[in-house]
């Protein structure tokens, strides 16, 4: 695979690359690059997470040595799953199982547990050094990476450790690339700034889009005055709002019901969850999407790329109901092997039930 091909694969469907020039230089160096994503095991896996899962797959195929960090301690600090570490660890196992059955070759991943990292004194020395090189105001602004606002630091002081831990994860693993949703931008920018002060390697940040919730992306009064990445974090698909999300364990019928009830105004592409599912989840997996229609309405039509489909939708050539049916059909094809894998393992079925009762924001 050429450098241009690797670059195209790594950057496709990314919301932001900081910076593209640095990424190209790293690829041109011909050194084996190391990347990572850390995930909080915080509940059921919804399809929004498939966006970064696909990007992990892309990076592995592009020859990047990827680390998957099971951020169990981070989830505990963030009060996920009631702060029950045993349940958090179960959720981590479940997440890795989903990633594997999505099609990521987990044998090529370096899977690291935060539990192991926090046992190392060198790790905590890094956390302190990062904190010493960061202002309190900067740390508080970065709390949105946890899905929290700056004022929520008053809940308990451990919340203030979280951003320094995330930056320390990056330095401890000696990474070239950090992958995350756009909601992780503040942590990655903090890491880049602190790297210069501490003489550490400056990461390239790859930010994937956040899938909007099924209710759509109508701007709420709560988002007034917020930065764009924080606004997207507010309207994203969330496991704490089950009817706004599609979970990988949902039945075929539930997927169809949720898709058919989703926000999808005729001719409108902005913050349209159905179009986003097609763009970020379905088209990266399939060469085409077929819209089945009655012959009276023009008959079946196939689209070989997302841009062509979006244009047709904006121009009113595709009806929302036809779009939804095609989306549900393709999405269920992607989810079927994941569902079957979870069904074959009773421990995961039991885990899903426990997690469903314990999900927190």
From Swiss-Prot:
Q: Which reaction does it catalyse?
A: tRNA(Tyr) + L-tyrosine + ATP = L-tyrosyl-tRNA(Tyr) + AMP + diphosphate + H(+)
Span(s) of short sequence motif 'KMSKS' region:
236-240
Q: What is this protein called?
A: Tyrosine--tRNA ligase
Enzyme class name: ligase
Q: Name one GO molecular function term.
A: tyrosine-tRNA ligase activity
EC numbers for this chain: 6.1.1.1
Compartment(s) where it occurs, according to its Swiss-Prot or TrEMBL record: Cytoplasm
Pfam families xrefs: tRNA-synt_1b (PF00579)
What organism is recorded for this protein?
A: Saccharolobus islandicus (strain M.14.25 / Kamchatka #1)
